[in-house]
UniProtKB/Swiss-Prot annotation:
Organism annotation: Campylobacter lari (strain RM2100 / D67 / ATCC BAA-1060)
A GO term from the CC aspect: cytosolic large ribosomal subunit
Protein name as it appears in the record: Large ribosomal subunit protein bL35
GO biological process: translation
InterPro entries reported in the protein's UniProt record: Ribosomal_bL35 (IPR001706), Ribosomal_bL35-like (IPR021137), Ribosomal_bL35_CS (IPR018265), Ribosomal_bL35_sf (IPR037229)
Keyword DNA damage: no
């Protein structure tokens, strides 16, 4: 049986670490002038994929 192909868009969006999957924040592409500096600072940091979505992301990444 051939190996499963990973979803290339998912590979670009997620990074796999030690037992966790990191993701970037949304709401940072445009219309940034009305967003406060504190919110922009918080959006800069990377987050972890929520436990309810881990299984789906792992399937996309071929893990």
């Amino acid at each position: 049986m051939p190996k499963m192909k990973s979803v290339k868009s998912a590979v670009k969006r997620f990074k796999v670490g030690k037992n966790k999957i990191k993701r970037g924040s949304a709401f940072r592409s445009h219309i940034l002038t009305k967003k406060p500096a504190k919110r922009m600072r918080d959006l800069r940091t990377s987050k972890y994929v929520h436990s309810t979505n881990v299984k789906a992301v792992e399937k996309m990444l071929g893990i």
